[in-house]
């Protein structure tokens, strides 16, 4: 999917105060009316949910999270906690995007097929509960990105994107989260487990489970060796092995000995092939 032209999105509110940005977002949410927020527990959807509860009241808002093998168990637990903090009802929808052969093929547009399945399920929930709209945490930077196939599914289903619609960038989202004192205001982005699998490597339930085990093993090892980590990914590269990506501070703190032990711990989790470490780069295996 090509990036949307800047002319199709409103001016950024990046330089507004948090209070001004909040006023604009709340006004937009009031115009949308009762809705379901497609929720992940991350900062983007949490800001939309927090704003919706403030603008419409908890009785007019529902949060929904798609639960499938691509969702790490820690992320599901986090989403339950955050929804509870915001006073919103959270509905867990079991989805089976992995049953779609186009999703499993992982040919570069996997996110489209995933979002189509997930958002169709959320739209069905909205209809059953008598809520007029579904909203996502898509922000202006997402719309400007070069490769966001999932946005096509959202457009096809007429899902609203209140953050992007008011011109909120990721920086503004963080500012709003701090303004509302959300517990996830500094939470790193945590996309689905399938995002760790290189394009062309089939996405299966077993491979998704392997990614989750590998990241838990890697995180545990680094904690044991007192290496603070903000961003951690274990990328599966098919015949090329795997790559562990860490934020720069963590990468700098990893000694030669710790590096060897980390790669061995990941191999013990069942990941085979040549392993390497690199600086974390968001979307380095975009699909």
Give the residues covered by each predicted segment.
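A short interface-forming secondary-structure element
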Residues: 236-257
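Mid-to-C-terminal catalytic subdomains of enzymes
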Residues: 164-231, 277
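Short, flexible, solvent-exposed loop/turn segments with mixed acidic/basic and small polar residues
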Residues: 149-152, 232-236
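Intrinsically disordered, low-complexity coil segments
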Residues: 12-18, 59-60, 220-231, 237-240
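ATP-dependent adenylation/nucleotidyltransferase module used to activate substrates
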Residues: 2-179, 242, 260-275, 279-283, ...
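A short, flexible beta-alpha/helix-coil linker loop
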Residues: 98, 198-200, 249-250
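Generic alpha-helical secondary structure
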Residues: 119, 207-215, 251, 255-259
């Amino acid at each position: 999917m090509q990036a949307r032209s800047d002319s199709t999105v409103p001016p950024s509110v990046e330089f507004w105060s948090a209070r001004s940005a909040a006023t604009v977002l709340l006004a937009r949410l009031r115009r949308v009316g009762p809705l379901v927020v497609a929720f992940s527990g991350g900062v983007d959807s949490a800001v939309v949910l927090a704003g919706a509860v403030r603008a419409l009241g908890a009785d007019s808002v529902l949060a929904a999270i798609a639960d499938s093998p691509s969702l790490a168990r820690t992320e599901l637990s986090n989403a339950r906690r955050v929804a509870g903090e915001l006073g919103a009802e959270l509905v867990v929808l079991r989805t089976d995007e992995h049953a779609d052969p186009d999703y499993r093929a992982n040919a570069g547009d996997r996110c489209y097929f995933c979002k189509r399945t997930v958002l169709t399920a959320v739209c069905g929930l909205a209809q059953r509960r008598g809520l007029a709209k579904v909203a996502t945490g898509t922000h202006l930077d997402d719309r400007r990105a070069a490769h966001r196939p999932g946005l096509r599914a959202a457009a096809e289903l007429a899902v609203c994107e209140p953050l992007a619609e008011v011109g909120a960038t990721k920086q503004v989202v963080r500012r709003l989260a701090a303004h509302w004192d959300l517990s996830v205001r500094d939470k790193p982005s945590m996309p689905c487990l399938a995002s760790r699998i290189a394009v062309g490597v089939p996405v299966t339930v077993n491979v998704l489970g392997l990614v989750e085990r590998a990241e838990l093993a890697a995180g545990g090892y680094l904690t044991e060796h007192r290496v603070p980590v903000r961003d951690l990914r274990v990328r599966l590269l098919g015949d090329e092995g795997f790559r562990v990506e860490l934020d720069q501070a963590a990468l700098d703190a990893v000694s030669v000995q710790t590096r060897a032990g980390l790669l061995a711990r990941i191999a013990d989790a069942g990941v085979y092939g040549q392993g390497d470490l690199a600086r974390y780069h968001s979307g380095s295996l975009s699909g």
